[in-house]
From Swiss-Prot:
Biological process annotations from GO: de-etiolation; regulation of transcription by RNA polymerase II; regulation of unidimensional cell growth
Entry-linked PANTHER family: MEDIATOR OF RNA POLYMERASE II TRANSCRIPTION SUBUNIT 7
Assembly mode: Component of the Mediator complex. Interacts with MEE14/CBP1.
Coiled-coil annotated residue ranges, if any: 64-92, 132-166
Pfam families reported in the protein's UniProt record: Med7
Protein family: Belongs to the Mediator complex subunit 7 family.
Protein localization: Nucleus
Name recorded for this polypeptide: Mediator of RNA polymerase II transcription subunit 7a
Protein backbone atom coordinates (compact mmCIF):
# COMPACT_ATOMS: atom_id res chain seq x y z
CA UNK A 1 0.00 0.00 0.00
CA UNK A 2 1.48 3.33 -1.07
CA UNK A 3 1.18 6.34 1.17
CA UNK A 4 1.83 9.95 0.28
CA UNK A 5 4.29 12.05 2.20
CA UNK A 6 1.87 14.95 2.21
CA UNK A 7 -1.92 14.87 2.13
CA UNK A 8 -3.63 15.98 -1.08
CA UNK A 9 -4.26 19.72 -1.37
CA UNK A 10 -7.65 21.04 -0.35
CA UNK A 11 -10.14 21.39 -3.19
CA UNK A 12 -10.00 25.20 -3.08
CA UNK A 13 -7.55 25.31 -5.99
CA UNK A 14 -10.36 24.18 -8.30
CA UNK A 15 -12.08 27.51 -7.71
CA UNK A 16 -9.20 29.22 -9.55
CA UNK A 17 -8.88 26.97 -12.62
CA UNK A 18 -10.11 29.67 -15.05
CA UNK A 19 -8.19 32.49 -13.38
CA UNK A 20 -5.58 32.84 -16.15
CA UNK A 21 -8.28 33.43 -18.79
CA UNK A 22 -10.68 35.37 -16.59
CA UNK A 23 -9.23 36.92 -13.41
CA UNK A 24 -12.75 37.91 -12.32
CA UNK A 25 -13.75 34.25 -12.05
CA UNK A 26 -12.05 33.88 -8.66
CA UNK A 27 -14.37 33.85 -5.64
CA UNK A 28 -14.70 36.97 -3.56
CA UNK A 29 -12.64 37.07 -0.36
CA UNK A 30 -14.55 36.44 2.84
CA UNK A 31 -15.90 39.49 4.65
CA UNK A 32 -13.75 40.93 7.45
CA UNK A 33 -14.35 39.51 10.88
CA UNK A 34 -16.32 41.76 13.21
CA UNK A 35 -16.43 41.37 16.97
CA UNK A 36 -14.83 38.41 18.69
CA UNK A 37 -13.20 35.36 17.14
CA UNK A 38 -11.22 32.33 18.28
CA UNK A 39 -7.64 31.81 17.12
CA UNK A 40 -5.46 28.97 18.44
CA UNK A 41 -7.85 28.46 21.33
CA UNK A 42 -7.80 32.08 22.50
CA UNK A 43 -10.66 34.57 22.24
CA UNK A 44 -9.75 37.81 20.50
CA UNK A 45 -11.66 40.90 19.46
CA UNK A 46 -11.27 43.18 16.46
CA UNK A 47 -11.80 46.27 18.59
CA UNK A 48 -8.64 48.04 19.72
CA UNK A 49 -9.57 48.88 23.28
CA UNK A 50 -6.98 49.15 26.01
CA UNK A 51 -8.58 47.78 29.17
CA UNK A 52 -8.17 49.98 32.21
CA UNK A 53 -6.03 48.91 35.11
CA UNK A 54 -9.12 48.61 37.31
CA UNK A 55 -10.64 46.14 34.84
CA UNK A 56 -7.46 44.10 35.18
CA UNK A 57 -7.58 44.27 38.97
CA UNK A 58 -4.43 46.38 39.28
CA UNK A 59 -4.26 49.58 41.35
CA UNK A 60 -3.45 52.64 39.25
CA UNK A 61 -0.34 54.37 40.58
CA UNK A 62 -0.54 57.49 38.42
CA UNK A 63 -3.27 60.16 38.20
CA UNK A 64 -6.33 59.57 36.03
CA UNK A 65 -5.99 63.04 34.53
CA UNK A 66 -6.55 63.42 30.78
CA UNK A 67 -3.68 65.93 30.61
CA UNK A 68 -1.21 63.37 31.90
CA UNK A 69 2.48 64.08 31.42
CA UNK A 70 3.57 60.64 30.26
CA UNK A 71 7.26 61.41 30.39
CA UNK A 72 7.20 62.49 34.03
CA UNK A 73 4.91 59.65 35.07
CA UNK A 74 7.11 57.07 33.36
CA UNK A 75 10.18 58.54 35.06
CA UNK A 76 8.40 58.52 38.41
CA UNK A 77 7.30 54.91 38.02
CA UNK A 78 10.80 53.94 36.90
CA UNK A 79 12.34 55.53 40.00
CA UNK A 80 9.74 53.84 42.16
CA UNK A 81 10.54 50.52 40.49
CA UNK A 82 14.25 50.95 41.17
CA UNK A 83 13.54 51.78 44.80
CA UNK A 84 11.30 48.73 45.22
CA UNK A 85 13.92 46.46 43.65
CA UNK A 86 16.52 47.74 46.11
CA UNK A 87 14.06 47.23 48.95
CA UNK A 88 13.44 43.70 47.68
CA UNK A 89 17.16 43.02 47.87
CA UNK A 90 17.21 44.27 51.47
CA UNK A 91 14.16 42.18 52.34
CA UNK A 92 15.70 39.07 50.81
CA UNK A 93 18.80 39.56 52.95
CA UNK A 94 17.12 40.57 56.23
CA UNK A 95 13.60 39.05 56.16
CA UNK A 96 13.33 36.47 53.35
CA UNK A 97 9.83 35.43 54.39
CA UNK A 98 8.41 38.88 53.50
CA UNK A 99 9.50 38.96 49.86
CA UNK A 100 6.01 38.20 48.46
CA UNK A 101 4.66 41.65 49.36
CA UNK A 102 7.58 43.36 47.57
CA UNK A 103 7.15 41.14 44.52
CA UNK A 104 3.47 42.12 44.36
CA UNK A 105 4.37 45.82 44.55
CA UNK A 106 6.99 45.44 41.81
CA UNK A 107 4.48 43.57 39.66
CA UNK A 108 1.96 46.38 40.13
CA UNK A 109 4.55 48.98 39.12
CA UNK A 110 5.47 46.96 36.01
CA UNK A 111 1.81 46.65 35.03
CA UNK A 112 1.35 50.41 35.43
CA UNK A 113 4.44 51.06 33.32
CA UNK A 114 3.19 48.71 30.62
CA UNK A 115 -0.26 50.29 30.69
CA UNK A 116 1.20 53.77 30.24
CA UNK A 117 3.40 52.58 27.39
CA UNK A 118 0.53 50.73 25.72
CA UNK A 119 -1.62 53.85 25.89
CA UNK A 120 1.06 55.58 23.79
CA UNK A 121 1.04 52.90 21.07
CA UNK A 122 -1.57 54.59 18.82
CA UNK A 123 0.44 57.81 18.88
CA UNK A 124 3.61 55.85 18.10
CA UNK A 125 1.91 54.11 15.17
CA UNK A 126 0.70 57.42 13.73
CA UNK A 127 4.13 59.01 14.13
CA UNK A 128 5.79 56.01 12.47
CA UNK A 129 3.40 56.16 9.52
CA UNK A 130 3.97 59.90 9.16
CA UNK A 131 7.73 59.33 9.17
CA UNK A 132 7.49 56.55 6.57
CA UNK A 133 5.29 58.70 4.34
CA UNK A 134 7.67 61.65 4.62
CA UNK A 135 10.56 59.38 3.64
CA UNK A 136 8.60 58.10 0.65
CA UNK A 137 7.80 61.65 -0.44
CA UNK A 138 11.46 62.60 -0.12
CA UNK A 139 12.55 59.54 -2.12
CA UNK A 140 10.02 60.29 -4.84
CA UNK A 141 11.13 63.91 -5.04
CA UNK A 142 14.72 62.74 -5.38
CA UNK A 143 13.68 60.29 -8.09
CA UNK A 144 11.88 63.08 -9.98
CA UNK A 145 14.93 65.33 -9.67
CA UNK A 146 17.14 62.50 -10.92
CA UNK A 147 14.84 61.94 -13.89
CA UNK A 148 14.85 65.66 -14.69
CA UNK A 149 18.64 65.78 -14.45
CA UNK A 150 19.01 62.76 -16.72
CA UNK A 151 16.49 64.20 -19.19
CA UNK A 152 18.45 67.46 -19.36
CA UNK A 153 21.67 65.51 -19.82
CA UNK A 154 20.09 63.45 -22.60
CA UNK A 155 18.78 66.60 -24.28
CA UNK A 156 22.24 68.14 -24.07
CA UNK A 157 23.83 65.02 -25.57
CA UNK A 158 21.25 64.97 -28.36
CA UNK A 159 21.86 68.65 -29.05
CA UNK A 160 25.63 68.08 -29.14
CA UNK A 161 25.16 65.09 -31.44
CA UNK A 162 22.88 67.12 -33.70
CA UNK A 163 25.40 69.96 -33.86
CA UNK A 164 28.18 67.47 -34.59
CA UNK A 165 26.18 65.84 -37.39
CA UNK A 166 25.04 69.22 -38.71
CA UNK A 167 28.64 70.45 -38.83
CA UNK A 168 29.83 67.60 -41.09
Amino acid sequence: MATATYPPPPPYYRLYKDYSENPNSAPEPPPPIEGTYVCFGGNYTTEDVLPSLEEQGVPQLYPKDSNLDYKNELRSLNRELQLHILELADVLVDRPSQYAKRIGEISSIFKNLHHLLNSLRPHQARATLIHIMELQIQQRKQAVEDIKRRREEAQRLLKDAYLTLDGQ
